[in-house]
């Protein structure tokens, strides 16, 4: 009886995962659009606005990391399995963490030139890769639910 309940709970969690993954697709697109505008805002002297937006984007990407971990566990995806080109869940999470630290350090040191470069080259790249990895996870979800 207990095993049956656990299976039902797990199946329910998997079913609820789909809408969350689709919502995250939209959020990642929104993050990408916002990141593309940040360097221009920096150059226009709107540092406070950029830093505020960057905090919101980082919080959203932190939520993405949590969702990705949960989805991988629920869908039995090995964290070391390559889901997009040579990117696995584990590698993407490490890359995001490393780039978050670089962005935080640049912001703390008020190195806005470096911060702009990190946004343009690293963060935008991370978001694009995150979108592709999420697409792979969503396909796995759809295969499992069907």
What does each of the following model-derived ranges do?
Residues 1-146:
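C-terminal-biased regions
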């Amino acid at each position: 009886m207990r095993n049956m309940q656990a299976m039902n709970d797990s199946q329910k969690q998997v079913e609820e995962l789909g809408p969350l993954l689709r919502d995250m697709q939209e959020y990642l697109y929104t993050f990408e659009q916002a990141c593309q505008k940040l360097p221009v805002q920096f150059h226009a002297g709107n540092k406070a606005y950029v830093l505020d937006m960057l905090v919101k984007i980082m919080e959203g990407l932190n939520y993405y990391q949590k969702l990705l971990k949960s989805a991988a566990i629920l869908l039995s995806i090995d964290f070391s399995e390559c889901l997009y080109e040579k990117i696995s869940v584990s590698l993407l999470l490490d890359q995001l963490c490393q780039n978050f630290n670089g962005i935080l350090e640049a912001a703390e040191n008020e190195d806005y030139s470096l911060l702009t470069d990190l946004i343009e080259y690293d963060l935008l790249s991370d978001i694009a890769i995150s979108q592709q990895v999420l697409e792979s996870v969503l396909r796995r979800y759809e295969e499992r639910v069907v």
